[in-house]
Every structure is written in C-alpha cells, then in structure tokens.
C-alpha cells in the first residue's frame, strides 16, 4: 500500500485479556474489606506439600477475599488463588463459615463444579487454590447479552443441572445458585462455584432452618423460615432459566422488601414471546410449595430439554453477541462443517432438511439496538466526569479496578485507506475486517476461510473464501490485501488458529462506524464498544456501556479495566480523567452523527 495509508496498532495487552475468572469469589464491587495489615506475599508456599505458587495478576475481589492468578513454580500450571486475610476472620462464626466452605468444596470433584486444588495458611492469610475459569461467569455474559437464544439457555442450563445433580447425590445443597457463581472455562463449560452458603444434609428428610447470608434467588420457604432442603436449588435454577431467557430476574424490583414480598406471593409474569414449553418448565420450578417442584433428577427429562436443539459447544463470540442460530443445524449443507450437522442424540423433533445451493450464503437479519448503547455510554461518562475524579484529596484508582469487565473484543490494528476503499482492521482474535466506503462490511475469521458479510441495511450473510458469490470477489481480494498489509507492517502474523468445535456458530462484532480527529481515531463496534486510540502518546480507551467499564492502556502499555461507577467513588489520575472528558465529546459526536454516513468527517 502507498504512503497514503495510515496505520495503527494496539499496545501490548496482558497475557490474554478477557480470559480470567474468579471462582468462589462474589462479584467485584461488594463492599471492599478493610486493607489487610500485611502485604500478600509474591510467592505463596504450602507448608505441607512444599509447593510454591507465584502470584500473578489480580482477578477480582468480593466479600473478604481477593483473587489472583497463581502459577505452580515448578509445573507452571495456572490456578485461581483465593486469598483471605485472617484479620477479617476474627469472629468464631466467620472462621466456622470459611472452614465449612472449604470442607464441602474439597469433597467435590465433577466436570461442572469448580475444581478444588488445595488450601493452606500462613500467619496472616488463608490461601485456597481453585480451578481458573478464564471466561468469568454467567453474570458478565448476562450483562453483555441480556436475553439469550433458547439453544444457548438449554446449553448452559443442562450443565447447571448436571452439576447440581452431582451436589444433591452427595447430599450438598448449594443454596446460592446465581449467575455470578456459575463460572465459565475456556470451552464455555459451566462450573458451579462459591460454596460459602452451602450445607450438607446429615440425614434423610432433614430440613435446614437457618441460612447465614442473603442468596440472590432466595426461595419462599427460606424466607418463611419453615425449614428447607434440596428444593431451594431447583427454585434457583428456575430463576436462572427465567433470567437467561427473559433478560432480567423474575422477582426483581429496586427494593429488597418488595422483591421478598413478590417471592412470597409468587408474583411474576412470563413474557408472551417465551416458548410455551420453556414457560411451563419455569412455572414448574417456581412453585411456592417445594414438594410440588420437580426434583433435580427429573429436570433433564422435561420437554424443554428433550425436544429442543442443544449445541455441543458454543463459540467464544457468544459472550458478546448472539450466535448464528438462524442457521438451524440441519439446514446446513451436509458436506459443510460436520459439528453443526450432528444434532443432539435422541432428539425427538429434528429440524427439517432445507438444502441450499452451495454458493447461496446463509442470511441473518440483525435486530440492532437503535443507538447501539451510545446513550447509555454518554450518561455513564457524564456521571463520572461530573464527579471530577482527579480532584480528590486521596485518589485510590486501584480500588476501581474490575478485571471481570475486560472486553472480549477490541481493535488490535487498523489501516486507513478510505480515500480509495475503506478502513481495514484486525480484532484481538486475529480476525480481519473492512468497512468499505459503500457502507458494507466483510470479515474474515481467524480460521482464514469463514466470511461474514454485512450489507448496508445490517443483513448478515455467512460464506467462505472457497465458496462465495462472484459479486463478492473484488471485496474478498481487497480484504486479503488489507490483511497482508497489516500482517507485514503492523505486527508479526498471528499463529495458525486451530478451529474448535462450536466455531461454526460464531458471529463477530463488526466495525459500525469510525472517524478521525487531529488527536485520535474513534472506532465503534456493533457490540456497543467504543475504542479511542490517541495518536501522540499511543494511549487507548476501550469503553463498554454494557459492563459500564473502561479499559485504559497507558504509555507504558499497561492494560487495566475499571468500573466507571467505582472511578466516581475512588477517583483516578489526571491522565485518565482528561481522556474520559475527551471520550464524552467523541461519544456525543457519534450519537449526533449516527444517521449520517459511516465515514464521519471530523472537523
């Protein structure tokens, strides 16, 4: 490409942003515990086994615990280290609660339960070594996606039920099943975690009378203190199923007393658009009488699970945008990508075959939020800027850090050739896209063959480099040109990506719009994220309105993610504050220009 091309690249990110998890730790943002008297050591030593763990990056905090990535000094195996200061375990009931949590969790081993790998202590801390769940929890998924597609909900719920079946077989009642305690590994497998409220049933028919703490999805029999047992977990799964399909919890109000009143009265409604089979299962689980609810072992025999499609795997892209379920698995060309042609074993009502011509792309109409969350982002930025975060007597920016909000996708490289063709860019997963001057977009996935084409009206088509309509030949050639340029000039080419099962359902966010000013380039993705790359010092902001968070990459290429509401509370440095003020102006510009052409002319 000629000298007319302008290029940019993203700074060095952490080892793999967006791939961290905090099993067993409540959502960050719970009231922060008082700072421990002692510093957490850099190397944690288990005195019994002599194993040494090197403390890595911060993963999050909640309740009394802080969580870090830790790695075995010898094997290099990576875990999540839950670290609790003993200064916060002074009362007998606090120590007993921690002991009970460890005692129950260490007795469990199942594919859908967070792995427990040991615990030890020194004079100042208790250390718990847990399986690292790199894709966080269903809570972050819910914040980004709200209502899921029915096959996704089935996929997650099946695994939750399997994990809970195991707990109940082992006489354990979890008592706090909620989105934030359902963690996800790299393969998007569910892992049940946080056994802080769990209890063990000592004899058949035992009804537990007390419960320390407030579960999110609390069952009516717990509120009435009449005694409760395994049925409370089925109630919670009913609440989870409702939340996954509807996009909000069934009894949610702004006031806890009102919520509890609704639970006692069983006052909730299921929207009309929910599949009657799904609605029926929710109603069965959310019955006030615990004995009327299905048992955990009966759930998977329900029609919701037996008659609907359950994907074997889901792609990582599902964490931020819906998958391609408009291509029903059996409607694909049988010779095309085997995993999708195989429906669940024992499926009662397989979808009818709908053969298509080889070159006919699969089309999906996109239902996009009108302003793609820009109004929410503007409000969030207005709020944080109005608090004057850098004008504090004491700025505690590190307290606002929330790694759970790390973006799933961002632009890692870009190249401006809009005088002729458009803007080319690469996402952090090594996929490459072009927003052409005619307002169409084309994305090449990191497998080097799959393509996603988005027309001016937002209609999406899925095709491949090896099989596409002739009308797209020129655009595919240009896309390859952009890709080769970025590989050669901006960063060394990424390693070959091994396709994983589930990738055939992937849909990537695309570049919705962009513009340049004298100071920066502003990029707006279809998942709502806005990225601002500053030219002079190469600092960057990635704003996510759904997580209400900002990722700041400073001059040292340090990559940190903050919750905007916590920056209001704890303050931030002048450098970040000035960039947040600039971001507000740019988001305002995006909003006022959204009806204009995709290539906004900056003044």
UniProtKB/Swiss-Prot annotation:
PANTHER family: SERINE/THREONINE-PROTEIN KINASE PLK, SERINE_THREONINE-PROTEIN KINASE PLK1. This is Serine/threonine-protein kinase PLK1. Residues 13-35 have a biased composition (Low complexity). Placenta and colon. Activated by phosphorylation of Thr-210 by AURKA; phosphorylation by AURKA is enhanced by BORA. Once activated, activity is stimulated by binding target proteins. Binding of target proteins has no effect on the non-activated kinase. Several inhibitors targeting PLKs are currently in development and are under investigation in a growing number of clinical trials, such as BI 2536, an ATP-competitive PLK1 inhibitor or BI 6727, a dihydropteridinone that specifically inhibits the catalytic activity of PLK1. Changing residue 492 to R: Severe mitotic defects leading to prometaphase delay. Increased localization at kinetochores leading to increased levels of phosphorylated BUBR1. Residues 351-364 have a biased composition (Basic and acidic residues).
């Amino acid at each position: 490409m000629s000298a007319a091309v302008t290029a940019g690249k993203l700074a060095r990110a952490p080892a793999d942003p967006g791939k961290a998890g905090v099993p067993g730790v409540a959502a960050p943002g719970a009231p922060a515990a008082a700072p421990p008297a002692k510093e957490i050591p850099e190397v944690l030593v288990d005195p019994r086994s002599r194993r040494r763990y090197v403390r890595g990056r911060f993963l999050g905090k909640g309740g009394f615990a802080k969580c870090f990535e830790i790695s075995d000094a010898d094997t290099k195996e990576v875990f999540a280290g839950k670290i609790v200061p003993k200064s916060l375990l002074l009362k007998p009931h606090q120590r007993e609660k921690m002991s009970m949590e460890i005692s129950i969790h260490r007795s469990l081993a199942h594919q859908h339960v967070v792995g427990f790998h040991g615990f030890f202590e020194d004079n100042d801390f208790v250390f718990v070594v847990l399986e690292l769940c790199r894709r966080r929890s269903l809570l972050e998924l819910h914040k980004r996606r709200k209502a899921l597609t029915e096959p996704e909900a089935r996929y997650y719920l099946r695994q939750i039920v399997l994990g809970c079946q195991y707990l109940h077989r082992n006489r354990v009642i979890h008592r706090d099943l909620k989105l934030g305690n359902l963690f996800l590994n790299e393969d998007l497998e569910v892992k049940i975690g946080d056994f802080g409220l769990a209890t063990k049933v000592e004899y058949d028919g035992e009804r537990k009378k007390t419960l320390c703490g407030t579960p999110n999805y609390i069952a009516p029999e717990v509120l009435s203190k009449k005694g409760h047992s395994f049925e409370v977990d089925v109630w919670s799964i009913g609440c989870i199923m409702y939340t996954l399909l509807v996009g909000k919890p069934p009894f949610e109000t702004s006031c806890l007393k009102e919520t509890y009143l609704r639970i006692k009265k069983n006052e909730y409604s299921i929207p009309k658009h929910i599949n009657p089979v799904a609605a029926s299962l929710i109603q069965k689980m959310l019955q006030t009488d615990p004995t009327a609810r299905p048992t955990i072992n009966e759930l998977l025999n329900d029609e919701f699970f037996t008659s609907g499609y359950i994907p074997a795997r889901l792609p990582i892209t599902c964490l931020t945008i819906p998958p391609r379920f408009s291509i029903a698995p059996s409607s694909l060309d049988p010779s095309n990508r085997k995993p999708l042609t195989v429906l669940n074993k024992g499926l009662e009502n397989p979808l009818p075959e709908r053969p298509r011509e080889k070159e006919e792309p699969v089309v999906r109409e996109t239902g996009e939020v009108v302003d793609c969350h820009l109004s929410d982002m503007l409000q969030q930025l207005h709020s944080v800027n109005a608090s004057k975060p850098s004008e504090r007597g004491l700025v505690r920016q590190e307290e606002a850090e929330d790694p759970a909000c790390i973006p799933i996708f961002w632009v890692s490289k870009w190249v401006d050739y809009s005088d002729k063709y458009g803007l080319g860019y690469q996402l952090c997963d090594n996929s490459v896209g072009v927003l052409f001057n005619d307002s169409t977009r084309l994305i090449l996935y990191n497998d080097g063959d799959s393509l996603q084409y988005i027309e001016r009206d937002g209609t999406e088509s899925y095709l491949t480099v090896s099989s596409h309509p002739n009308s797209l030949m020129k655009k595919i050639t240009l896309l390859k040109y952009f890709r080769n340029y970025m590989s050669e000039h901006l960063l060394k080419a990424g390693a070959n990506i091994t396709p994983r099962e589930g990738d055939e359902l992937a849909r990537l966010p695309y570049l919705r719009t962009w513009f340049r000013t004298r100071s920066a380039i502003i990029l707006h993705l279809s998942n709502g994220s806005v990225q601002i790359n500053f030219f002079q010092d190469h600092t960057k902001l990635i704003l996510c309105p759904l997580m209400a968070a900002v990722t700041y990459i400073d001059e040292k290429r340090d990559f940190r993610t903050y919750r905007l509401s916590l920056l209001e509370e704890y303050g931030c440095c002048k450098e970040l504050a000035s960039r947040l003020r600039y971001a507000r102006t740019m988001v305002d510009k995006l909003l006022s220009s959204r009806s204009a052409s995709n290539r906004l002319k900056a003044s």
